[in-house]
Amino acid sequence: MALWGVSDADESKPKWLSDTDKSNTFASAAGWVLRKTVGSRTLEEVLVAAQGLATGIGVADITAIDWVSTTFDRSAGGTLSATVSYNEAVTVSGTPTLSVTNGNQGSGSGRGPHVLTYASGSTTNQLTFTLAIGAANAATNANDVLSFGANAVAHAGGSTIVDTVGGGTATITSAAGIGTAAGTITVVA
């Protein structure tokens, strides 16, 4: 088996990368690229040159959904933030959304799902989605468990997510396992 390849499978990324580096690696017209942030600078390095890789692998696919925030305090309020990673750079138009399931484990019911809106990341392989929730807001209760399910990304209000190279419509469907891998956030009082 090769260490890398030209296919739309996430497994085609260079094998020696750490899990974090795999999330920051994407296909480009030049090959597999690793994006790192060093201080205030964002650096990109071509790890494996494979001319035309981004067009050869087809449409962009979701490879991971991860929480940026790892906790949420209902009494203080704050911003829920998550990143959706693609296997190649995508361009966003409009305001797509990301749905978060609230298991309503806290007292009461009827909270959620929560809808995070697109905040940043167009022309990269990582899109950030956010939702501000005020202090003591009824949207969450202590002990609620927030998670991602299958097909959490949606094209709200005519928004689009397309391949930056090639322009094909990026996949917005994802298996439940991708959301499950992100883990959960348990709301504290």
Model-derived regions: residue spans:
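Non-catalytic beta-sheet/beta-sandwich ligand-binding modules that flank or precede catalytic cores
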Residues: 1-189
